[in-house]
C-alpha cells in the first residue's frame, strides 16, 4: 500500500541535509553514500550522484528528472540472477 499523501514522501533527514549542502557547493559535487534505500527521490536530488548500498557495495546512481518519485533502492539491485542450472544429460553419440 502506498504512503498517504498527507504525510508526504519519506526522505532520511541526514540525506536531505547532505543534498542541500552539496547543491550549495557549485564547484565540485561530491558522491553521497547512503544506506537509506527507502528514501524517496525528490526534485532536490536532481543532478547529484548518490551511492546506494546494496548489502555488499555502494552502487553510484546519477539522479535524473525521470527518477523523481521513485525509491533509491529501486536502482540498486540486491540480488544477482545467474541463470537456472543447465540440463545434466550427456549428449547422445
Swiss-Prot record:
The GO cellular component terms are: cytoplasm; small ribosomal subunit
What top-level branch of life does the organism fall under?
Bacteria
Q: Name one GO molecular function term.
A: rRNA binding
List UniProt keywords, sorted A-Z.
Answer: Ribonucleoprotein, Ribosomal protein, RNA-binding, rRNA-binding
Q: Which PANTHER family match?
A: RIBOSOMAL PROTEIN S19P FAMILY MEMBER, SMALL RIBOSOMAL SUBUNIT PROTEIN US19M
Q: So what family is this one in?
A: Belongs to the universal ribosomal protein uS19 family.
Name of the protein described by the UniProt record: Small ribosomal subunit protein uS19
Q: Which organism is it from?
A: Karelsulcia muelleri (strain GWSS) (Sulcia muelleri)
Q: What is the lineage of its organism?
A: Bacteria, Pseudomonadati, Bacteroidota, Flavobacteriia, Flavobacteriales
Amino acid at each position: 500500500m502506498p504512503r498517504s499523501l498527507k504525510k508526504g514522501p519519506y526522505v532520511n533527514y541526514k540525506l536531505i541535509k547532505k543534498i542541500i549542502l552539496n547543491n550549495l557547493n557549485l564547484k565540485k559535487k561530491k558522491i553521497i553514500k547512503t544506506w537509506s534505500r527507502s528514501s524517496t527521490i525528490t526534485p532536490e536530488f536532481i543532478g547529484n550522484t548518490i551511492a546506494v548500498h546494496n548489502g555488499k557495495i555502494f552502487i553510484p546512481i546519477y539522479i535524473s528528472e525521470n527518477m523523481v518519485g521513485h525509491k533509491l533502492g529501486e536502482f540498486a539491485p540486491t540480488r544477482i540472477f545467474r541463470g537456472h542450472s543447465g540440463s545434466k544429460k550427456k549428449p547422445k553419440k
